[in-house]
């Protein structure tokens, strides 16, 4: 371990195997906190490579509690959080809409990073059981088409890094690992990142982790596909990465200002999301969710973004998406 940490002190990048060894020891609680802080700082200052991120993610997945993985195509739709904009819970809402459009979604989530209400806070308010067993969660994906895996239930080892992360008060590699360590191991993923600089490296990381089809996005300051500006995309298909940009017009929608999709506390968000999922939200709110669902649908082979967007809006207007919230709450 000394050799690995010394390599970081010399600003040398680790191999994927070395990174996996380092994070394996961190997750097992076997690395001295001072050394852990040094290693995380050295990685941050050097800039984490796709190899290092993939190695860390593999270590966390190897140490995670097991989940009975479906053998069909299924996805995660998730953002890193930490974009600082406190928007409504777009990816959580989009998960229900995507399921209403016939996709299978197993969403990995945690308490909030930057918004006043993270995905788990919102789900809690709808009466959805976050402590659902892995078997029940899997059954929900099978039967309802959507379920949520609450990170602390599967990744207990992350607690060993918590005191160091809280003391450091800065972003570390852990801030980007969450979306990469879904214990259900989806083969399709739409992942939003808080910085445009991360789009390509995270796509390269996903490629190394064997993702079948995925897109990494940053939307004009947001860790989502944007309704207020352009979105930078790195898409994985057939083992290759293609980079492109999207605008609201590509989805057949007008753009709306960022203020139009601001969120609130969990209770306010619950009211907003209920309106969206029953088609009573504003055009901006429905559009913000629909563009994310539309890109996720593309990853399942439905290439026409405009048609996908209309299908997503219809799933909200019909109330079908909200019915899935009620079914998931009853499932527990």
From Swiss-Prot:
Tell me which SUPFAM superfamilies the record gives: Nucleoside phosphorylase/phosphoribosyltransferase catalytic domain (SSF52418), Nucleoside phosphorylase/phosphoribosyltransferase N-terminal domain (SSF47648)
List of residues binding anthranilate 1: 79, 110
- Recorded GO CC terms: cytosol
- Kindly report, in one word, the top-level EC class recorded for this enzyme: transferase
Identify the EC number(s).
2.4.2.18
Q: In which pathway does it act?
A: Amino-acid biosynthesis; L-tryptophan biosynthesis; L-tryptophan from chorismate: step 2/5
Q: Does the keyword Glycosyltransferase apply?
A: yes
**Source organism's superkingdom?**
Bacteria
**Pfam families for the chain:** Glycos_trans_3N, Glycos_transf_3
Q: Name one GO biological process term.
A: L-tryptophan biosynthetic process
Instruction: Tell me where the transmembrane regions lie.
Output: none
- InterPro entries attached to this UniProt entry: Anthranilate_Pribosyl_Tfrase, Glycosyl_Trfase_fam3, Glycosyl_Trfase_fam3_N_dom, Glycosyl_Trfase_fam3_N_dom_sf, Nuc_phospho_transferase
Give the reaction(s) catalysed. Answer: N-(5-phospho-beta-D-ribosyl)anthranilate + diphosphate = 5-phospho-alpha-D-ribose 1-diphosphate + anthranilate
Query: Can you name one GO molecular function term for this protein?
Result: anthranilate phosphoribosyltransferase activity
Which cofactors are named for this entry? Mg(2+)
Keyword hit for Isomerase: no
Which positions in this protein are listed as binding Mg(2+) 1? 91, 224
The family this protein is said to belong to: Belongs to the anthranilate phosphoribosyltransferase family.
How does this chain assemble? Homodimer.
Concerning PANTHER family, the annotation shows: ANTHRANILATE PHOSPHORIBOSYLTRANSFERASE
Name by which UniProt lists this protein = Anthranilate phosphoribosyltransferase
In which organism is this protein found?
Vibrio parahaemolyticus serotype O3:K6 (strain RIMD 2210633)
Gene from which the chain derives: trpD
């Amino acid at each position: 371990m000394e050799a690995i940490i010394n390599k970081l002190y010399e600003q040398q990048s680790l191999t994927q195997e070395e990174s996996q060894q380092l994070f394996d020891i961190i997750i097992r609680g076997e690395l001295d906190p001072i050394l852990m802080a040094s290693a995380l700082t050295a990685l941050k200052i050097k800039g984490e490579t796709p190899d290092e991120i993939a190695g860390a993610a593999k270590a966390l997945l190897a140490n995670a509690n097991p989940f009975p993985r479906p053998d069909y195509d299924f996805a995660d739709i998730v953002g890193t959080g930490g974009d600082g904009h406190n928007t409504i819970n777009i990816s959580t809402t989009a998960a229900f809409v995507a399921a209403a459009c016939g996709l299978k979604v197993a969403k990995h989530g945690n308490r909030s990073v930057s918004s006043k209400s993270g995905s788990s806070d919102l789900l809690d308010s709808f009466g959805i059981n976050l402590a659902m067993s892995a078997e029940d969660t899997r059954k929900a994906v099978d039967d309802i088409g959507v379920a949520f895996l609450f990170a602390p239930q599967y990744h207990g080892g992350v607690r060993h890094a918590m005191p160091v992360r809280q003391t450091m008060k800065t972003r570390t590699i852990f801030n980007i690992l969450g979306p990469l360590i879904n214990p259900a191991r989806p083969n399709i993923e739409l992942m939003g990142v808080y910085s445009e600089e991360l789009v390509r490296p995270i796509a390269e990381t996903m490629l190394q982790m064997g993702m079948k089809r995925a897109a990494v996005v940053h939307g004009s300051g947001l860790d989502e596909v944007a309704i207020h500006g352009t979105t930078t995309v790195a898409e994985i298909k057939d083992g290759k990465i293609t980079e492109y940009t999207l605008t609201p017009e590509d989805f057949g929608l007008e753009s709306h200002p960022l203020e139009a999709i601001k969120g609130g506390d969990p209770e306010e968000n619950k009211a907003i999301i209920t309106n969206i999922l029953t088609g009573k939200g504003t055009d901006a709110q429905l559009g913000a969710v629909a563009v994310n669902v539309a890109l996720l649908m593309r990853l399942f082979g439905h290439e026409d973004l405009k048609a996908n967007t209309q299908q997503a809006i219809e799933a909200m207007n019909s109330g079908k998406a909200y019915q899935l919230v009620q079914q998931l709450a009853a499932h527990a």
